[in-house]
């Protein structure tokens, strides 16, 4: 049902895009808009992951440079029946994470140093399981298409204002009114559709992520910490590129301006409540988390030995053990 709803919303955005093209240039403008939409999505399909990772200066790591973090992702990917994704670290104090890639065979997951420093290993596992759920559900591709179309609709809405619409279809005042409505309504409508798609997929990824890591309370605890951290610690790169906000597990925008007027994510308390209900239905009453170890020295990095012995000697067990 979620995939059907998502497909319908993307189709709606495509119709909106073509409609603005029609206002600008009649039938020819509509076809040009369609060609532009297809071209932009093809470019995004092949290059969006590289672009966003470069945007956040993400550093790829492996089993030698980040053993615990890498093995954790490897174990979770095995639990989910997924190919091993590329694993990245973003040097950013705000705790957060995202996944990208056009399909499970070409996927990447990234976590900030703030997340790896501030969360327990179990909470990190819950977060990375959520990101792998996005990969498994192919949400990374869906959201790339939605974001591309939303940006294109906004761009064409502005063009409609400056160009004054198609003269053949303008017919005086009605043409002017139609152009103004396209300029104002289309970007907001695209934003609302983007929000609807993102919110639907977040709930699905929470549920599947909890199944992958085995304990919904790990993810619910992590969401609370990340939400508090996102409010307290600005993510400057995300503030400069708000179009990427929907990719993160929690909205990274601090709301210093009007960034949070329309949220790309469901309410965090509602997500936590859903996960707690899921845990109760599974008969899980406790997250079973060991106390978070002190952050390692800068030389080893916050991901080098977070939580103790990677073989499980610190007393906790999880999919990374």
Swiss-Prot record:
The chain crosses the membrane at residues 7-24, 29-46, 145-165, 173-193. It is found in: Cell inner membrane. The active site is at 131. Pfam families: Peptidase_M48 (PF01435). Residues 304-321 have a biased composition (Gly residues). InterPro entries: HtpX_protease (IPR050083), Pept_M48_protease_HtpX (IPR022919), Peptidase_M48 (IPR001915). This is Protease HtpX homolog. It comes from Brucella anthropi (strain ATCC 49188 / DSM 6882 / CCUG 24695 / JCM 21032 / LMG 3331 / NBRC 15819 / NCTC 12168 / Alc 37).
């Amino acid at each position: 049902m979620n995939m059907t709803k998502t497909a319908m919303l993307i189709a709606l955005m495509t119709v909106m895009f073509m409609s603005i093209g029609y206002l600008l240039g009649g039938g020819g403008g509509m076809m040009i808009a369609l060609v532009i939409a297809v071209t932009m999505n093809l470019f995004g399909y092949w290059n969006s992951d590289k672009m966003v990772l470069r945007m956040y200066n993400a550093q790829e790591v492996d089993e030698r440079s980040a053993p615990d973090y890498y093995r954790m992702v490897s174990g979770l990917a095995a639990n989910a029946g997924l190919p091993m994704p590329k694993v990245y670290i973003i040097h950013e104090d705000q705790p957060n994470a995202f996944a990208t890639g056009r399909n499970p065979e070409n996927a990447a997951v990234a976590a900030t140093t703030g997340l790896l420093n501030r969360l327990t290993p179990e909470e990190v596992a819950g977060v990375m399981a959520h990101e792998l759920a996005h990969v498994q559900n192919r949400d990374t591709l869906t959201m790339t298409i939605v974001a591309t179309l939303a940006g294109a609709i906004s761009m064409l809405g502005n063009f409609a204002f400056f160009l004054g619409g198609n003269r053949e279809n303008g017919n005086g005042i009605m043409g002017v009114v139609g152009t103004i409505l396209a300029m104002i309504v289309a970007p907001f409508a695209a934003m609302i559709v983007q929000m609807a798609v993102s919110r639907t997929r977040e709930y699905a990824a929470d549920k599947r992520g909890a199944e992958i890591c085995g304990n919904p309370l790990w993810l619910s605890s992590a969401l609370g910490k990340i939400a508090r951290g996102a409010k307290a610690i600005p993510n400057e790169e995300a503030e400069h590129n708000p179009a990427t906000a929907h990719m993160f597990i929690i909205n990274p925008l601090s709301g210093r301006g009007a960034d949070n007027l329309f949220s790309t994510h469901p309410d965090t308390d509602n997500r936590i409540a859903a996960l707690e209900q899921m845990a109760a239905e599974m008969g899980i009453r406790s997250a079973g988390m060991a106390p978070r170890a002190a952050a390692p020295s800068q030389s080893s990095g916050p991901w080098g030995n977070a939580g103790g012995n990677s073989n499980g000697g610190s007393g906790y067990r999880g999919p990374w053990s």
